[in-house]
Amino acid sequence: MNEINRSPDLEMVVLKEISSAIVNERNGTALLRHILDVLYRRMKMLRGTFTIRRGNDLMIEASHGLDEQEMKRGHYHVGEGITGHVAETGRPHVIEDISRDSRFLNRTRTRKSGEKVAFICVPIIHLQQVIGTLSIDRAVDRDTDLERDQKLLEIVGNIVGDALAASLQAHEERAALVAENEKLRELLTTNPGELI
């Protein structure tokens, strides 16, 4: 179970742990997972995701509380659902109870019917461009302050922008290398003389 501490210092504890992870973790996806782990332990987060924008699509890059199949289902178009709307507008969005909001798509199929859970989604911006989103499902009780949580997640999203941009760049470089290798294999197979 996550250890929630709603003291006035919660934000400082979360930011200190995340900034330490940013300094020490070089792998972008591992860093994003570490950040989600901090949010789980400190904020009553049930599930969380970082998405990366690729063209007009958003794909889950890292998650907490989702298995591989659920992550694969977490594919959105910009403008679609809450996550897509946040990516389109660059503005955060809070849903106090996802079971009562028809805009919430539950694409990953991880939410149970009737489960009272809040959803907070914030944009991740790098060089004035929305490059992804950070979203969490959060348990709600009488001490929940969703506005405070949203503000904290906005700060986290702002400081993670560079790391997510690096992860996006690594994906693009990897895709370019794979495409180049495929092209070379095809040339080698069909026209080996053209390689000389």
Q: What do these predicted ranges mean?
A:
Residues E154-D162:
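Allosteric cytosolic regulatory segments
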